[in-house]
Amino acid sequence: MKVTVLDSIDAIERDEWDALVGTEYPFLRHAFLSLAENTGSVSPDAGWTPRHLVLRQDGRLRAALPLYEKNHSWGEFVFDWAWANAYNQAGFDYYPKLVSAVPFTPAPSARLLRARADDTDAAEILIAAATELAVDTDCSSLHVLFPDENDVPLLEDAGLILRKDCQFHWHNRGYETFDVFLATFTSAKRKKAKRDRRRVAENGISFRRVRGSDFDGDTWSMVYALIARTFMMRGSLPYFNQAFFEGLGRELPDNILAIIAEQDDQPIAAAVFFESDTALYGRYWGSDGHYDALHFETCYYQGIDYCIETGKQRFEPGTQGEHKVARGFVPATTWSAHWLAHPEFANAIERYLDEEGRHIDRYMDAVDAHTPYKAGEDET
């Protein structure tokens, strides 16, 4: 067996990589990672140096780990700025560090990619190789962000420190229509959701869906301009550039969906989603101004509508946002796993994460008490 470090995802054949990924997580596909690298959003100049690990046995690809060497903590959605500050104050370098993640994509998915799901030996070899690489390259630490529930116990068994967090997800309980879904709400919460949707309709706003295969350059230019405007209104630039978005339509046409809001036949807002056969993932949002309840409608209600129509089992709209709860999303635990070379810092962070995890548990319990569902209808 041999573990190799790749300095680009293009150093491995697309079909080989995708055979490990499967179809559930489109943003783990070779095309997504390749576009991110080749359009410049993920590159050494941007602080993301690819260090992907592949494990081969007799020439056959057995397992892989998406991995990057980073000199900052932007685009991760698992916040370790305080750790970096503590290192700096103690006279140590926190950067570079190794991060296993999908860049700018806070969606739980497999990290320890294996040809056979039960190949725990391969997972252990990858984890050991990643920590060894961290030592060999003078990285302070290894961070595995948003692993799925199958990876978490393997990472814990390998000695990584687990960190718990919370997102809000929607689950399809076999709803035939949106109204059937709303019927599971209490009366007051159902009225609020209907009022949200009514406000948008009363403003003369309509919606259309565009699949990746139907996008052209003009459509992507319009969607990207809306997304970029919203990012810049918040004082930042989009994580990905327009070339990346245009590439998605070409390379992943069956996995991309945009919902475009229009008023007087003019586009005023757009949300971009990824989809698999079973799930919808909300990723990017933009508008040309403020419209009452439009964000809720475009990013949440329209997505739920689409899931019900297509029979998707769950909808993950992105990070943070307690406002999602009133729209039918419920708390879901997410994880990250961390290895730090410095033993004293590792011990201190482990103690901190133990307390943080208890706080997250209390927070999720409190949120559970305020979901909009009737007694007996709650999704938790």
Give the label of every model feature segment.
Residues M1-T380:
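N-acyltransferase acceptor-side catalytic subdomain
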